[in-house]
Every structure is written in structure tokens, then in C-alpha cells.
Amino acid sequence: GQGETLEGNPDGKRPVVGGNTFVVVEAEGDDLVHSDGKTAAKACELLAEYAKRQKPFFLGVGFVRPHVPFVAPEKYYSPFLPYSKMKLPHKVEGDWDDIPKPGINYKTSVNMKMDVRRQKKAVGGYYASVSFMDAQVGKVLTALKKAGLEDDTIVIFTSDHGFHLGEHDFWAKVSLLDESSQV
């Protein structure tokens, strides 16, 4: 598929890398090519087995997305193309004036060297990753219903942190502002 490293790549020469960096990959293949697709499929399989047992069960289903790098099958990107239509948050002059220096997120548009085009692509990549993860959650909830377990099962959907998408000119999670700390 198509991929681009957005962070620290102002001249566009840096290759697509993995790890905890802003990369967008419009990946080839279907959901099952990706770990989250495989996780959802296995959870659905287990729910069908648990329904036959008619005993209490616990099933923890953890998805990677929408964590960076933003990787999802191409079909999840199409609603967010072209990236140029993505809206960026309004920048407030003096927004950091009341934040002590240690509280300034180290992931800013400036120090990540992300121009407006790359910022918009990051937003589109995040939205595509959320859409992909949402589809996987939908498969698990559908399997729960199909197994006849939905009325007797408690589903807890949570996350470990929020995520900045350019609000306050911050990106990722490392701040105490609402966008990062609330889930």
C-alpha cells in the first residue's frame, strides 16, 4: 500500500518506519491481514464456543489501533480522502502562556517538522485507524449477539489515554490537557 512518514520528515526522504512515530499506511489486503482483524476474528470464534458452554466467562479483547503508526486497510481511508479536506483545530494565540515549560508537549507541529499537509494527513490517518478499529469492535459485538450472549454479558469499552490531533499545536498523548488525559 501507500505509506508516508509524517514526523521528522520535512523533505519527504525518510522511509516508512514502524514504532511510536507518525506514519500513515494505506495498507493492501483485508482486515485479516492486520493484527486487529485477527484479534476480532479470534474473539468471535471464542464467543461462539463460550455460548455452547453456558458458563460465565471473561474475554479481554485488546486492539492496537488507533495507535501510531496509523495502519489500516485502504478501504478505511477512502472517506477521509483527499487529506486536504481534513480540518485542523483552530490555533489560539498565547495558548501556551499559562503552561509551565515542563508541561509543553514535546510532540508539536514545529518540533515534529509537520507542515499543514502532513498534519491533515495525520488527522485522516487517525480517523481511518479509528474506523478500522470500530469495524473490529462491531464484529465482536455482532458475534456476541449472534451467540445469544448480549443480554447476559457486560461489555466494558475503555482506553488508556486520549490523543491530540493538533489541538494546542500538540500531537499524540503526552500532556495533561483534556484531549490527552480524558477517554
Language model regions located:
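Active-site-proximal cap/lid insertion segments
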Residues: 1-41, 45-56, 60-183
